[in-house]
A protein has these predicted regions:
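Acidic, polar loop-rich interaction surfaces within structured domains
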Residues: 1-69
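Conserved functional hotspot residues or short segments at active or partner-binding sites
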Residues: 42-156, 160
């Protein structure tokens, strides 16, 4: 089902992510908090995203190793990701907003993995999904606009110097 995959944000640990036998060290996560991991996948065929219903096939298996606070014993949790697809506009607004944040990080880094996305795409996703009651989300929208102005100026200066 999957031809290639990449854990976004772990470009410096690409070999470790590619080897499914290696445990990746993570940071500490306090009680009541959560973490979100983004994987970019290259499907083995276009059919993967056309079938939106449950198929019985699994897309991936996520293995999580963790320990409880003040405990040295490691516990494991394994979860099979079903091979079903949900249109982006149908997922939770929080996940849509988190996607805009991830795209922003890739764009600022000038990652080769986000060359087809423009600042307006990031802004539109964030604008459509942010909660106006959450100050940090509103501030993020301003940050996207500021970054666009700065990075667009850099691009224009570079273009003029290339002439």
């Amino acid at each position: 089902l999957i031809k290639e995959y990449r854990l976004i944000g772990f470009d410096n640990r690409r070999d470790a992510v590619a080897d499914s036998t290696i445990d990746l060290e993570g940071g500490e996560l306090g009680s009541g908090n959560s973490v979100l991991a983004y994987f970019e996948i290259v499907p083995g065929s276009d059919q993967l995203f056309k079938d939106t219903g449950p198929s019985g096939e699994k897309l991936a298996t996520i293995d999580l190793r963790y320990s409880l606070c003040n405990d040295t014993a490691h516990l494991r949790f394994s979860w099979d990701c079903p091979a079903n697809f949900t249109d982006f506009k149908s997922i939770d607004k929080e996940l849509q907003f988190a996607t805009a944040v991830a795209m922003f990080g890739l764009k600022v880094k000038q990652s080769k993995y986000i060359r087809n996305a423009e600042w307006i795409d990031i802004h539109n996703i964030a604008q459509a999904s942010y909660d106006p009651n959450v100050f940090l989300q509103a501030e993020f929208l301003q940050l996207v606009d500021k970054a666009e102005a700065i990075y667009s100026r850099k691009k224009k200066k570079k273009s003029k110097s290339d002439d």
